[in-house]
Amino acid sequence: MADYQEYRRRILHRRWRRMFITAALLILLVLLAAVGVLWKRLHREPAPNTAQGPTILQQELTGSEWNTISYTPARRLSVQTLDNGMTAMDFRLAAQPASPAVERSSFSDVSFLGDSLTQGMQIYSSGLPEASFCAYRGANPSVVVNGTTCKRSDGGTEVPMEVLTARQPPVLYILLGTNVLNRDGDYSSFLTYYRLMLDMISQALPNTQIYVQSITPVRPEVRSSHPGLYKERLCEINNELAAIALEKNCAFLNLWEALADDNGDLKAEYAQPDGIHIKPEGYPAWVEYL
């Protein structure tokens, strides 16, 4: 009997020792987890700016809602000037440098995304009618972001992103903005939509080289009927577009090199009567630049 009691005592002792060790380990793990959570809270980084994400807009904004979207300006990049001074982003200096000319046939598999200015490139024989186009009168970046159904020049309808996603072009040229910049004042919503549009396109077309084209110059008299379309403001906006393009790993093209006169206005011989759109005679200069 004594041997049995001794044996039972030893078994219970081992059992309690195992239970004690297990409990101690559990307590230690809980303490370590608590310390880890506390450390993360004390050292966590600021939350990223969700305004730059590609999915915050799921419905189309119209009317008074247009200017309610916040915008954080693209990072300011410094560039070297001829007098060795440093200045903020200048779209003229940020533009893609010239490269050897290519044949028109090279544009047969590229796509253009734009508004009525780009429609001219599609319609006029002096443009690039052999290319593919997503060009719609009155279009702007929000149309692309919100998946709006757009009307083509031939009367058909389509959703721009659906067409581009199905097409997967090797190269895409974008020119959008004139239609929403008519009014003077804040243009932050336009830039926000432009950022979102580039994010969406880059995600949908991972193998496509994207070229962001500058807002085109206009004639000086345009300001009387369209207060937001004047040289100084368009230069400011193009500076922002150039910074956004570089930030998004897109190339930036300065169309003013091909279309503007020495004063920075749309060349008179290229201008339609409205001072904004381009005559057929102006498209060869645009094509040559591309």
Please annotate each region the language model reported:
Residues 205-209:
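A short helix->loop->beta-strand "cap" motif at the edges of active sites that frequently abuts
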Residues 187-197, 234-235:
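Charged helix-capping and loop-helix junction motifs
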Residues 175, 213-214:
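Alpha/beta-hydrolase-fold catalytic nucleophile elbow
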Residues 180, 216-219:
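Active-site-proximal loop/turn and secondary-structure-junction residues that shape catalytic pockets
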Residues 218-290:
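Catalytic His-Asp segment of secreted/periplasmic serine-dependent ester chemistry enzymes
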Residues 1-109, 118, 122-123:
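N-terminal secretory targeting modules
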Residues 100-192:
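Conserved SGNH/GDSL esterase-like catalytic core that processes O-acyl groups on lipids
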